């Protein structure tokens, strides 16, 4: 049986994804969940265990560091560590584990905010907004590179 692996399962999108998954899944979380198969890991400070992606066919990477009331310039390393380094670490582990699909939920901040009443298109100039947007954009670019080099299917939402 191939599993679905979900990071960010406790968030708004993650909770809905869990309800929509038809089949077995495993989550990565800072705390053990009584109702889910859980890999306990804090993306701010830990290495994702190698066995986390055993028998996984698809990864949904929803976790990220986004909202903080502190001055972003004083914690930019935390944004980078969670949004870029942990994402790359997870994608590289996915390749090593034979994962076929990697779905990354990014942010509108990675492309910049369109003017009111308009939408961004794939041909628009990318202008990430703030440290959050910059780190999400960097993660997108690194994931595309990993996917191209490895053959793993990468989708960015």
Go through each PLM region and give its residues.
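N-terminal Rossmann NAD(P)H-binding glycine-rich loop of SDR-like oxidoreductase domains
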Residues: 2-23
């Amino acid at each position: 049986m191939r599993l679905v692996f979900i990071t960010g399962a406790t968030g708004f999108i993650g909770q809905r994804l869990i309800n929509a998954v038809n089949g077995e899944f495993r989550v990565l979380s800072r705390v053990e969940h009584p109702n889910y198969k859980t890999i306990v890991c804090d993306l701010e400070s830990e290495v994702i265990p190698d066995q986390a992606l055993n028998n996984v066919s698809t990864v949904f990477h929803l976790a990220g560091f986004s909202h903080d009331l502190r001055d972003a310039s004083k914690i930019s390393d935390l944004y980078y560590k969670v949004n870029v380094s942990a994402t790359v670490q997870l994608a590289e582990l996915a390749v090593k584990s034979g994962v076929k699909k990697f779905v990354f939920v990014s942010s509108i901040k990675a492309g910049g905010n369109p003017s009111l009443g308009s939408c961004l298109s794939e041909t628009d100039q990318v202008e990430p907004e703030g440290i959050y947007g910059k780190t999400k954009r960097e993660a997108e670019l690194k994931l595309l590179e990993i996917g191209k080099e490895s053959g793993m299917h990468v989708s960015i939402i």
